Design a protein with these regions (language model features):
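Glycine-centered hinge/linker elements that transmit conformational signals in sensory
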Residues: 180-182, 186, 224-253, 300
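Hinge/lid segment of periplasmic solute-binding proteins
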Residues: 104-152, 203-206, 292-296, 362-366, ...
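Extracytoplasmic/periplasmic substrate-recognition and gating elements
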Residues: 63, 165, 237, 241-247, ...
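A structural signal for short loop-to-beta-strand junctions that line the ligand-binding cleft
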Residues: 88, 96-98, 126-161, 191, ...
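Conserved N-terminal structural module of periplasmic/extracytoplasmic solute-binding proteins
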Residues: 2-16, 20-108, 123, 286-289, ...
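Extracytoplasmic/periplasmic solute-binding protein
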Residues: 144-148, 153, 174-226, 240, ...
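Conserved C-terminal helix/tail region of periplasmic/extracytoplasmic solute-binding proteins
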Residues: 163-164, 185, 375-426
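Long, aromatic- and glycine/proline-rich binding clefts that accommodate carbohydrate-like moieties
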Residues: 132, 136-137, 295-298, 345-395
Length: 426
């Protein structure tokens, strides 16, 4: 599974040049060249593949295209570190990276800076994909990246433990914490709730979901910061008070996706906010999960009712400085195809972008969360659509982490964040 720091927010940043190709995938520097031409070896640059299936997909391509082989270059699990390395490669105009597996929030930034090329819409089955995911690959209505996986936050919960105390899946934060209190009292050593609370993109996602789920906005539709409000404070207080009263364990403040997944699979959590990829791993029957068959998923809870997820996912784009762009386009077509998306869903439980897969009876039976996930993606909120997204995200992380750590109050953290965001969104 690729790191998600996988998303209720979108991005806003940029265009293109291209390349005539030779037979090697390159590694030297050089400016952007020509059109979508050139066939030969290419690279796929991606975050750490914790799903274990990406190489299988690439192997399938390589077997059928021995003269156009794809080499996977894995970057760190941390999304911010991934972006940093991709940006460094782009700013040096290196041709070492061909196809970039971009978090949806980076598409606009890379397009605006002319680090990725515009792609021909007619070459891809965009009408078969979830419309919300297609929009994440566009910049000023032009296609720069193709969505291969989507994401929406889900609430994983221990169904067996809730059943034992007569609790139902919660729709509000109060219901979730009330159920926790009953379960934890009967199961010493089990913690109530965790998400992605380390200071990285995942915290931006979790903070934004909390604010949105309280009825607020981080950045409004007019592009203006909107965090110094009662609703935003209610969202942040949900996280801050959870830490204070122990319902969010202290160590959970260091969790990214994988740390939380391991804790949930070890039976340490009652509730876990996580992406769809966790489902297959947590339900594994090979002895790696202590909760297989004991959990279920539900929509994220909110302050007064069901909450709002952040729109996540990954898009494939082509570096402006790469060689063999024609091969890159053909490889993206292969990866976005229904056959590959179906196989990836069945192997990893990652959310597909191919809309029809969410309604197939056999898949819904195997992955009961698909119906709710589709609704989550369709209703998910984008991340702040601002040009300086990375700076905005860093400011959000600093404010949320400092409040959750008890270094500052929610009110002061949000007042300071409002000032910073106003400067960044001018």
């Amino acid at each position: 599974m690729l790191s998600r720091g996988n998303a209720a927010l979108a991005a806003a940043f940029v265009l293109v040049l291209s390349a005539c190709g030779t037979e090697d995938s390159g590694g030297s520097g050089g400016g952007a060249t020509g059109g979508l031409e050139g066939t030969g070896a290419i690279t796929l640059v991606t975050g750490k593949d914790t799903s274990g299936n990406l190489q299988n997909q690439v192997d399938g391509w390589n077997s059928a295209h021995p003269n156009e082989k794809v080499t996977v270059i894995e970057l760190p699990e941390d999304a911010d570190a991934q972006r940093q390395q991709m940006v460094q490669n782009a700013t040096t105009k290196s041709d070492a990276y061909t196809v970039l597996n971009l978090d949806v929030i980076w598409t606009a930034e890379f397009a605006a800076n002319q680090w990725i090329v515009e792609l021909p819409e007619k070459d891809f089955p965009l009408d078969k994909l979830l419309p919300a995911t297609v929009e994440t690959g566009k910049y000023f209505k032009k296609l720069y990246a193709v969505p291969t996986t989507s994401d929406g936050g889900l609430l994983y919960y221990r169904k067996d433990l809730l059943d034992a105390v007569g609790a139902k899946p919660p729709t509000t934060w109060a219901e979730m914490y009330a159920a926790c209190d009953k379960v934890v009292a009967a199961n010493p050593g089990v913690s109530c709730y965790a998400g992605q609370f380390e200071k990285y993109e995942g915290l931006t996602v979790n903070f934004s979901e909390a604010v949105n789920s309280a009825g607020g906005d981080v950045v409004g539709d007019d592009g203006k910061a909107n965090v110094n409000t009662d609703k935003a404070k209610a969202g942040l207080d949900f996280l801050v008070n959870g830490v204070k009263d122990g319902r969010i364990a202290a160590k959970a403040r260091t969790f990214k996706e994988e740390e939380g997944r391991r804790a949930f699979q070890a039976g340490e959590l009652v509730f876990h906010r996580q992406w769809p990829y966790q489902y297959a791993k947590a339900n594994a029957t090979d002895g790696s999960s202590q909760v297989a068959g004991k959990f279920a998923v539900a929509p994220l809870p909110g302050m007064d009712g069901p909450g709002s997820s952040t729109l996540g996912g990954h898009n494939f784009a082509v570096s402006s400085f790469a060689k063999n762009k024609k091969t890159a386009v053909e490889f993206i077509k292969y990866m976005v195809d229904e056959k590959q998306q179906r196989a990836n869903l069945e192997k990893t439980s990652q959310a597909p972008t191919w809309a029809a897969l969410y309604d197939e009876a056999d898949l819904v039976q195997k992955f009961p969360y698909l119906t709710e996930l589709k609704k989550s993606i369709e209703k998910a909120k984008k991340r702040p659509a601002v040009v300086k997204y990375q700076e905005v995200s860093s400011a959000i992380q600093e404010a949320a982490y400092s409040a959750m750590s008890g270094q500052t109050s929610s009110a002061d953290a949000l007042a300071s964040l409002q000032t910073k965001l106003e400067q960044l969104t001018k």
